[in-house]
Structure formats: structure tokens, C-alpha cells
């Protein structure tokens, strides 16, 4: 699992 991708997606989801 790419945590960076998840974190980036979460930031954009904000």
C-alpha cells in the first residue's frame, strides 16, 4: 500500500 498516495488523496479530499 502506498501511504504517500493515500495521504495525497486525503489532502485533495479536504
Curated annotation (Swiss-Prot):
Keywords: Amidation, G-protein coupled receptor impairing toxin, Mast cell degranulation, Membrane, Secreted, Target cell membrane, Target membrane, Toxin. GO terms for molecular function: toxin activity. It is found in: Secreted; Target cell membrane. Mast cell degranulating peptide. Activates G proteins (G(i) component), which in turn activates the cascade of molecular events cAMP-regulated, resulting in mast cell degranulation. Its main location: secreted. The modification Leucine amide is found at residue 14. Belongs to the MCD family. Mastoparan subfamily. Expressed by the venom gland. This is Protopolybia-mastoparan-II. One of its GO terms (cellular component) is extracellular region.
Amino acid at each position: 500500500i502506498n501511504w504517500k498516495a493515500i495521504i495525497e488523496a486525503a489532502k485533495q479530499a479536504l
